[in-house]
């Protein structure tokens, strides 16, 4: 499902190279997105603090038009809202919860803009504010769910907003550069520095990582778990699983453990 792609070389123009490798939005014809407007889902657009239009897709379970709980799903770097829609629709029905997914600046219907780290952070702010302000949802009923690149975006939001509800991280990383090389040489220009923020997060965190992940090594997930303040949710290290097939290996029961944490 369009996930985080590794950085294979670090040339002299290292910053430009990192930017190009981080953001790899798929090209999907604009009219395809019209199919995301259904009886159970709808596309909205909201504007970020920097004036960028952020596409948001709201998905409701077929048997529950007014769900009390919502997941905010932050996708990987090779995905957009269209490519994750089928997975999230199925997840919504099985969990009986609403789901919000959104595109980062430079992705999907926002593709005319240039993707940046700050643009990603602005985008999740818009998505969560949509639930808080438009729907008046209590933060305790919102669950952040990040995959690959989206884990760093999720952690940044939780860190800045003193988040208390449980969050889900699938294939998390310490930082972008350490996916390839754990060296102080590249740290001055590093991006999405998850490990630097995880120490200050107080909420429960559920981590999933494939033992055969050859894009983001499982040592990243284990280091993130070791650094958590709240270890009340056991991590799941999934055998015979890589980077691109992990979502299909996570069970509904494992995700429900997070959604029902406060029940």
From Swiss-Prot:
Q: Which SUPFAM superfamilies match?
A: alpha/beta-Hydrolases
What family, per the record? Belongs to the AB hydrolase superfamily.
Top-rank lineage group of the source organism: Viruses
Please provide, alphabetically and separated by semicolons, the GO molecular function terms listed in this UniProt record: hydrolase activity
E.C. designation(s): 3.-.-.-
Which InterPro entries is this protein grouped with?
AB_hydrolase_fold, Hydrolase_4
The record, for Gene3D superfamilies, names: alpha/beta hydrolase
Spell out the protein name for this chain.
Putative alpha/beta hydrolase L404
Identify where the record puts lipid attachment of type N-myristoyl glycine: 2
Source organism of this protein record? Acanthamoeba polyphaga mimivirus
Going by the UniProt record, its keywords in alphabetical order are: Hydrolase, Lipoprotein, Myristate
Q: What class of enzyme is it?
A: hydrolase
């Amino acid at each position: 499902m369009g996930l985080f792609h590794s950085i294979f070389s670090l040339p002299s123009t290292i910053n430009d190279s990192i930017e190009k490798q981080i953001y790899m939005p798929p090209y999907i014809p604009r009219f395809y997105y019209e199919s995301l407007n259904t009886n159970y889902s709808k596309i909205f657009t909201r504007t970020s603090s920097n004036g960028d239009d952020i596409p948001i897709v709201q998905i409701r379970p077929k048997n529950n038009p007014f769900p009390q709980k919502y997941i905010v799903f932050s996708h990987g770097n090779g995905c957009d809202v269209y490519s994750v829609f089928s997975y999230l629709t199925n997840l919504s029905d099985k969990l009986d919860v609403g789901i919000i997914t959104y595109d980062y600046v430079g992705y999907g219907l926002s593709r005319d803009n240039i993707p940046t780290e700050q643009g990603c952070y602005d985008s999740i702010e818009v998505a969560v504010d949509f639930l808080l302000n438009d729907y008046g949802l209590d933060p305790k009923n919102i669950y952040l769910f990040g995959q690959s690149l989206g884990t760093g975006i999720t952690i940044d939001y939780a860190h800045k907003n003193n988040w208390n509800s449980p969050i889900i991280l699938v294939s998390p990383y310490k930082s972008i550069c350490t996916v390839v090389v754990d060296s102080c040489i590249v740290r001055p220009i590093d991006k999405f520095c998850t490990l630097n923020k995880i120490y200050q997060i107080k909420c429960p965190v559920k981590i999933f990582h494939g033992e055969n992940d050859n894009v983001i090594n499982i040592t990243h997930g284990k280091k993130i778990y070791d650094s958590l303040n709240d270890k009340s949710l056991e991590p799941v290290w999934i055998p015979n699983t890589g980077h691109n097939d992990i979502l299909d290996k996570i069970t509904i029961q494992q995700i429900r453990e997070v959604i029902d944490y406060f029940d």
